């Protein structure tokens, strides 16, 4: 774990997509239109957790399970748990092709911080541990598991509920207990089921104003069936399984609030109706990697624009630290900025209503979000 971080903390989150049916649903016309979406609804749902009102970061938001990377996620005690894979590159995860624009949480030499656990492994351990703490879903495999057999939808193994409940409380109190739990249960966190999806760095809100920031690795996994879920009544107050379209509909109608990264990623998922197609996509690009995105905010006359790398408004060399960079202010309307044309990779917020405008080519074999038709877009 990189203890030299000054401006943000490192975190990991997990998009849990679970099959809801082995057949096909009849097509239901959604209220929110996605122009390229197939004419059937998803046969899977995504888990979103509601953060506590008392949370110091994004209170009341619906987010994917996840949290801070702890020193125990990098503990060399994991070597014994993963003994079968110690000699394989990244414990059998393989080597990601692109390294230039990746976050240091992946590329930094963890041995310099006294750890034998690669960042690729530790971030996945964190995502699995936090998912267990917040939702009760435990993604583990037996100690004799063959990672090469992990190309299918994940099966969540039934465990003794009382035993798991006790371990969950232990891990919530002390994250290092996750190691002890795996040793006693003779299992391993199923790091091979988690495929790298994206990487978001909390934007700088304004110069001189300190706010909580996180460099967050987003992983995704596809489950063959929805597992049992229970909130922790601490950081998480409720949960819900949604199809990506349904979650965005509820956000559009102000029933829930979804932060920009989750909004963007749910919009990406709208490309995939069958979970098998989603799973095939994430497996095929699993070693392509991704670049870290930090939104740069532009304040316009009539709304806010979150610009992302590749957008014509995005700075060539953004100040990630926030020591120099301020929020960009413009005396133009959002419509005027759009009419100028060019490359768009931005999230527009007018009266709290979101619109994604994206016309750039995605990198690393990824996919752009399907743009949402909302009232704010009708104003443009």
Curated annotation (Swiss-Prot):
Gene3D superfamilies: Nucleoside Triphosphate Pyrophosphohydrolase. A motif (Microbody targeting signal) lies at residues 378-380. Its cofactor is Mg(2+); Mn(2+). InterPro entries: NUDIX_hydrolase-like_dom_sf, NUDIX_hydrolase_dom, NUDT19. Mg(2+) binds at residues 130, 134. The keyword Nucleus does not apply. It is found in: Peroxisome. One of its GO terms (cellular component) is mitochondrion. Its EC number is 3.6.1.-, 3.6.1.77. Its main location: other. GO terms for molecular function: coenzyme A diphosphatase activity; magnesium ion binding. Keywords: Hydrolase, Magnesium, Manganese, Metal-binding, Peroxisome. One of its GO terms (biological process) is propionyl-CoA metabolic process. The keyword ATP-binding does not apply. Residues 8-264 form the Nudix hydrolase domain. A motif (Nudix box) lies at residues 115-136. The record marks 51, 57, 212 as: Important for coenzyme A binding. It comes from the Eukaryota. It catalyses: an acyl-CoA + H2O = an acyl-4'-phosphopantetheine + adenosine 3',5'-bisphosphate + 2 H(+); CoA + H2O = (R)-4'-phosphopantetheine + adenosine 3',5'-bisphosphate + 2 H(+); hexanoyl-CoA + H2O = hexanoyl-4'-phosphopantetheine + adenosine 3',5'-bisphosphate + 2 H(+); octanoyl-CoA + H2O = S-octanoyl-4'-phosphopantetheine + adenosine 3',5'-bisphosphate + 2 H(+). Fatty acyl-coenzyme A (CoA) diphosphatase that hydrolyzes fatty acyl-CoA to yield acyl-4'-phosphopantetheine and adenosine 3',5'-bisphosphate. Mediates the hydrolysis of a wide range of CoA esters, including choloyl-CoA and branched-chain fatty-acyl-CoA esters and at low substrate concentrations medium and long-chain fatty-acyl-CoA esters are the primary substrates. Highest activity seen with medium-chain acyl-CoA esters and higher rates of activity seen with the unsaturated acyl-CoA esters compared with the saturated esters. Exhibits decapping activity towards dpCoA-capped RNAs in vitro. Belongs to the Nudix hydrolase family. This is Acyl-coenzyme A diphosphatase NUDT19. It comes from Xenopus laevis (African clawed frog).
């Amino acid at each position: 774990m990189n203890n030299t971080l000054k401006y943000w903390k490192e975190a990991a989150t997990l998009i849990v997509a679970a099959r809801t049916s082995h057949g096909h649903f009849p097509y239901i016309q959604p209220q929110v239109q996605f122009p390229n979406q197939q004419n059937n609804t998803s046969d899977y749902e995504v888990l979103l957790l509601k953060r506590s009102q008392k949370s110091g970061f994004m209170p009341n938001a619906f987010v994917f399970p996840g949290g801070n990377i702890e020193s125990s996620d990098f503990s060399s005690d994991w070597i014994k748990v993963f003994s079968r894979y110690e000699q394989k590159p990244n414990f059998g995860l393989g080597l990601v092709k692109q390294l230039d624009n990746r976050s240091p949480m992946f590329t930094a030499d963890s041995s310099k911080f006294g750890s034998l656990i690669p960042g690729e492994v530790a971030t996945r351990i964190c995502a699995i541990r936090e998912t267990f703490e917040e939702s009760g879903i435990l993604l583990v495999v037996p100690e004799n598991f063959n990672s090469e057999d992990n190309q299918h939808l994940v099966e969540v193994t039934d465990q003794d509920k009382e035993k798991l409940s006790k371990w969950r409380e232990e891990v919530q109190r002390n994250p290092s207990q996750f190691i002890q739990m795996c040793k006693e249960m003779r299992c391993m966190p199923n790091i091979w089921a988690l495929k790298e999806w994206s990487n978001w760095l909390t934007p700088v809100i304004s110069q001189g104003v300190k706010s909580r920031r996180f460099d967050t690795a987003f992983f995704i996994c596809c489950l063959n069936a929805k597992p049992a879920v229970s909130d922790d009544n601490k950081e998480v107050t409720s949960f819900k399984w949604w199809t990506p379209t349904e979650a965005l509909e509820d956000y559009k109608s102000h029933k829930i609030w979804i932060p920009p990264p989750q909004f963007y990623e749910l919009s990406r998922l709208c490309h995939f109706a069958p979970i098998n197609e989603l799973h095939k996509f994430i497996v095929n690009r699993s070693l392509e990697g991704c670049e870290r995105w930090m939104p740069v905010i532009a304040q316009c006359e009539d709304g806010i624009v979150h610009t992302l790398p590749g957008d014509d408004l995005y700075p060539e060399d953004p100040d990630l630290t926030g020591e120099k960079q301020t929020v960009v202010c413009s005396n133009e309307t959002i419509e005027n900025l759009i009419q100028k044309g060019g490359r768009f990779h931005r999230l527009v917020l007018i009266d709290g209503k979101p619109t994604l405008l994206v016309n750039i080519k995605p990198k690393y074999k990824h996919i752009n979000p399907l743009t949402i038709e909302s009232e704010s877009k009708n104003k443009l």
